[in-house]
C-alpha cells in the first residue's frame, strides 16, 4: 500500500531524460553534439560559436528549439528529427523500475520537452514501451516547453488530470515549481548535477530522491 500522503493520487507524471534512466548515461552529450552540428549548418559558423549560440538559446528561451524557432523560423520537426538521431546503447532496462511502475496504481504519463518519436525509442529501450497511459511531448505543448506554466495546463487539460490528485517526478528542480503551484505533489530526482539543482527551492519539493527505481519500489511495497 502506498504511504498515506500518496494514497489519493490517481495520476503519476514522469519526466523522461535523466529521470527514467540514470543521468550518468548522458544522452544529452550526444544530443548536444547533434544540436551543435545543426546550428553550424544553419548559420554557417564553427563549433565554438554554435555552442555559444545554443547555450544562449537554452538560457533565454527554455530550449534550444524555442530559440531557433523565434530567431530563425526553424521547422521544429526537422530540428527534433536531426538532434534525436542518436545511439541509445548507453541506456538499458532497470528491472526494478519496470516492476515498480507495473505495481503503481493510477494512470501514468510521460511529460517531456523532447518529441514523441524519440521518447518512444527511449521507452522501448528501457523496457517501458507499454508502461504509460499517455505521452505529452513538445509538439503537444505547441513548442512551449517546461517550465512554462502553459505546458502544465496543456498536459492537465489534454489528459483530464486533476493536479490535486497527481504526482510529478522530475530531475530538473526548476521544472517542479509550476507543478507545485498547480497543486501537484512534487518529487525531485537529485542526480548531483549543478544544472539540475538550479532553483532547487525546498518550498516546491515534497520528496527528494536519488534513484527513481528504488523510490518507486519502496512506496509500492517491494524495496528488496
Task: Kindly give the residue locations of the regions a language model identified.
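Short glycine/serine/threonine/alanine-rich loop segments
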Residues: 45, 74, 106, 161, ...
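Residue-level marker of regulatory loop/turn positions in helix-turn-helix DNA-binding domains and
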Residues: 93, 111, 144
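Hydrophobic residues in well-ordered beta-strands that form the structural core
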Residues: 22, 110-112, 188
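Asp-based, Mg2+/Mn2+-dependent phosphohydrolase catalytic module
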Residues: 1-10, 102, 115-116, 120-224
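A generic structural signal for short
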Residues: 24, 53-54, 89, 107-108, ...
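N-terminal helical cap/lid subdomain that shapes the substrate entry/recognition surface
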Residues: 2-14, 19-98, 117
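Internal catalytic-core helix/loop-beta-alpha segment
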Residues: 101-109
Amino acid at each position: 500500500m502506498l504511504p498515506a500522503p500518496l494514497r489519493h493520487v490517481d495520476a503519476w507524471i514522469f519526466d523522461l531524460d535523466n529521470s527514467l534512466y540514470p543521468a550518468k548515461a548522458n544522452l544529452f552529450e550526444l544530443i548536444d553534439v547533434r544540436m551543435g552540428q545543426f546550428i553550424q549548418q544553419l548559420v554557417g559558423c564553427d563549433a565554438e560559436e554554435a555552442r555559444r549560440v545554443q547555450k544562449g538559446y537554452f538560457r533565454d528561451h527554455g530550449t534550444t528549439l524555442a530559440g531557433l524557432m523565434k530567431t530563425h523560423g526553424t521547422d521544429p520537426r526537422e530540428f527534433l528529427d536531426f538532434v534525436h538521431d542518436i545511439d541509445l546503447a548507453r541506456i538499458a532496462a532497470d528491472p526494478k523500475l519496470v516492476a515498480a511502475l507495473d505495481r503503481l496504481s493510477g494512470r501514468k504519463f510521460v511529460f517531456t520537452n523532447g518529441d514523441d518519436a524519440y521518447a518512444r525509442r527511449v521507452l522501448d529501450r528501457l523496457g517501458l514501451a507499454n508502461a504509460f497511459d499517455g505521452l505529452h511531448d513538445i509538439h503537444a505543448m505547441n513548442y512551449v516547453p517546461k517550465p512554462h506554466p502553459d505546458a502544465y495546463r496543456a498536459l492537465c487539460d489534454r489528459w483530464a488530470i486533476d493536479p490535486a490528485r497527481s504526482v510529478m517526478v522530475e530531475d530538473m528542480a526548476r521544472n517542479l515549481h509550476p507543478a507545485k503551484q498547480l497543486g501537484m505533489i512534487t518529487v525531485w530526482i537529485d542526480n548531483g548535477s549543478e544544472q539540475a539543482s538550479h532553483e532547487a527551492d525546498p518550498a516546491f519539493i515534497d520528496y527528494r530522491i536519488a534513484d527513481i527505481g528504488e523510490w518507486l519500489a519502496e512506496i509500492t511495497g517491494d524495496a528488496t
